[in-house]
Amino acid sequence: MALSFFGGGGASHLKYFDIRLDEDYIVFRGGEQEAASAQLSGKLLLCLSEPLSVKHVRLNLTGISRVCWHLPSSSATGGRKSWREKVFYEKSWTFRDAGKSKTEILAAGNYEFPFHVILEGSMPESVEGLSDTYVTYRFKAEIGRKYAKDIVVRKPLRIIRTLDSSALELSHAMSVENIWPNKIEYSISTPTKAVIFGTSIRVDFKLIPLLKGLKIGQIVSQLIESHDLTLNPEDPDSVRNTYKNTRTIVNDEHELDEEGNLEIIDEAAEGYQFSRFLDLPKTLTRCLQDTDTRGIKIRHKLKFRVQLLNPDGHISELRATLPVSIFISPNLAIDDNNNLVDQTPQSAQRAVNDLAQQAPPLYGEHQFDQLYSEVDPSGYRTPGPGSGPGTPFGTLSRNLSAENLASMNALTNTDISASALHSRLSNLHASRFSNPSPSDADGHTDAEYRRLGVSTDSFGPSSGSNSQSPASPELSRRPSDEGYHDHDYIPSGMATPFHPQFAEVESLSRVPSYSTAVRSSVGPCDSELPDYQAVVAEDTAMPTLQSPQQAHIRSVGRGVSTGHTGIDVHHLRSGFFNSRTSAHHDDDDRRLRLVQARARV
């Protein structure tokens, strides 16, 4: 910063005093009601070659809006000026404060005073380019001194409100098309309604004469900017003091070559089809962005005039208008004089390409989102520690047939060998062939589950649910449904150990191998699965039970219709458990018939 900007009397002690922002401008994406907040941060830099006595070191950010217009003078009265200025935003930072009527000495050296603030997305955007009407933000850094003039440095801040990548203006084409009877069929369109400031507007024309001998004359395309200024925008419409004005931003005149431009359009008629490009100014003093804030409303539209030279000699004129929206792109930097920094056509084309390839939302623009590297992964990664009891680990759920037990030592890191596991499983199957008393069965069940690490509390296995029927390895692929109906109320995972038990997972995942399956008898293809009545009819010596049979209980418990509706499941279970000891052998025979019927399918 040049020293001429400082006051005298000790200002020469300052080698450097400036406001440095992390970002040159603040960008809001979307309207005032939808845009997210943005963070403004930077540093106040101070370099002293000698000690300096100061009262305070402060930084202020001020937002000011001003609306002003001049009415033209007449012969009777002179010109009249209407204006209003208001401060709508203020933020202050105090870095040094010696107190009232006191000073402190800043030693020679370099100083950095960081600052930051969150700017709401509803804040007005910067509007600059008009002589007496604007919305601006300015920083003011001040070093207060007691017996000398304060040292002050200023810096402007630009807030840009651009369109969100999902805005309809970026995807909707604008067109006007109609038929002038016995004159011309026309279509005038633009690819998008939104246009980046400093680029160009493409206009597509399609003109088809309907009158023989009709010729197209001069075609005029204009970009019109309208200003709607209001001194008191917060008041009702009836009492607002407003002023409206328009100006022409771009004027393009074009004449067709009657011979060269004539072509066949849509394989139906002869006409003219061409495009015109309207280059926008590179400075805000000649063209503003569309806005509506703080009593300043700027809008743009395209106006077209097409001369039609009739065969009888008179001239007709076709007129049409199209609305367009001009917005400032963050990819095209604007300097303090409101001019584009890079005004080359290549820069404008890059901005258009970046907008077309933009994938919403831009990752770099979300400054307040927590980065993935800063997120605690606990609770997000799966499977969690609690999912192990009910989930096979790795390859342990595959190829665990009786013939493949020898290879399990290579798949697990447990201390249980394959032979030991095979022996335990054999003992477990052998114990199921025996017919212990109910008390013995209960004790055996508790011991087995304690050995396997399974709790026998109210959520664990009960004595009534442990089936005493034989279970063969060959039929272990189809899970048996008998004897487990009384656990339908237990949630999944409540009866399994919390910590992973690899040996239990292996035993539960044990399935017959392919060679075992092919040795099984195959029933005829046209045979159907026997129903419940067909299987029960084969048992002529079946004793009468005090309650429905176990298979019937399971069907009712699972919601399968059996012809007995409205039965209380709880009472059915109690009746079955009371008669379980007396009908045990008959139940085994009945299950065997069920298994044989399934094998024939």
From Swiss-Prot:
Gene Ontology biological-process annotations: regulation of protein ubiquitination; ubiquitin-dependent endocytosis
GO cellular component: cytoplasm; cytosol; plasma membrane
Extent of the signal sequence: none
Compositionally biased tracts (Basic and acidic residues): 475-489
Quaternary structure note: Interacts with hulA.
Region (Disordered), start-end ranges: 374-397, 454-496
Family membership noted in the UniProt record: Belongs to the arrestin family.
GO function term, MF aspect, one: protein-macromolecule adaptor activity
Function: Component of the regulatory network controlling carbon source utilization through ubiquitination and deubiquitination involving creA, creB, creC, creD and acrB. May be involved in signaling by recognizing appropriately phosphorylated substrates via its arrestin domains and then recruit a HECT-type ubiquitin ligase such as hulA, leading to ubiquitination of the substrate, providing a link between ubiquitination and phosphorylation in protein regulation and stability.
Organism for this UniProt entry: Aspergillus fumigatus (strain ATCC MYA-4609 / CBS 101355 / FGSC A1100 / Af293)
Name of this protein: Probable HECT-type ubiquitin ligase-interacting protein creD
Lineage: Eukaryota, Fungi, Dikarya, Ascomycota, Pezizomycotina
